[in-house]
Amino acid sequence: MAEQEFRHMVRITRKDVDGNSTIATALTEIRGIGKAFAIAICKVLDLDQDAQIGYIDDESVKQIEAVLENPQEFGIPEWFLNRRNDYETGETKHLIESDLNMTLRDDLNRMKMIRSYKGKRHEVGLPVRGQRTKSTFRHGSSVGVSRTRPTGN
């Protein structure tokens, strides 16, 4: 990694990250990349995960973007990716930023459209995964305690 002048903002896949952050921490600012995936990217590209991302060169940024574009070509295992066996295409891929947001929104809309249990729960804003609802997930205003008015003394 050749040293060059420090950049306060580094643009990686349509996202500006803080140049003062370490490489692993800066990658986690991108939606769809967690700590473990960021460390895996650093290991695959032989980058120091504790180095500041403001000092890496443009070639390293392009390599990071290439890994994010197709992680399996660089040896990242299939179980590490966040979209396995896609509903429409059957592909296994890793989604980030707006692609991830659109896919999640489409998945929710599909569940609502086919009227599945999870889709119905999402529609009415109730918990989906079987949590209790007697005391939690309450919406609306609370009813306060009424006080008796003091009699005129």
UniProtKB/Swiss-Prot annotation:
GO CC, alphabetical: cytosol; small ribosomal subunit
Annotated stretches, region: Disordered: 129-153
Biased composition (Polar residues): 143-153
Any Pfam family matching the protein: Ribosomal_S13
BP terms from Gene Ontology: translation
Entries under InterPro entries matching the protein: Rbsml_uS13_C, Ribosomal_uS13, Ribosomal_uS13-like_H2TH, Ribosomal_uS13_archaeal, Ribosomal_uS13_CS
Keywords, alphabetical: Ribonucleoprotein, Ribosomal protein, RNA-binding, rRNA-binding
Molecular-function annotations in GO: rRNA binding; structural constituent of ribosome
Keyword RNA-binding: yes
PROSITE patterns, per database record: RIBOSOMAL_S13_1, RIBOSOMAL_S13_2
Purpose of the protein: Located at the top of the head of the 30S subunit, it contacts several helices of the 16S rRNA. In the 70S ribosome it contacts the 23S rRNA (bridge B1a) and protein L5 of the 50S subunit (bridge B1b), connecting the 2 subunits; these bridges are implicated in subunit movement.
Family membership: Belongs to the universal ribosomal protein uS13 family.
Subunit note: Part of the 30S ribosomal subunit. Forms a loose heterodimer with protein S19. Forms two bridges to the 50S subunit in the 70S ribosome.
NCBIfam families (UniProt xref): PRK04053.1 (NF003140), uS13_arch (TIGR03629)
Protein name: Small ribosomal subunit protein uS13
Species whose genome carries this gene: Methanosphaera stadtmanae (strain ATCC 43021 / DSM 3091 / JCM 11832 / MCB-3)
Lineage of origin: Archaea, Methanobacteriati, Methanobacteriota, Methanomada group, Methanobacteria
Gene assigned in the entry: rps13
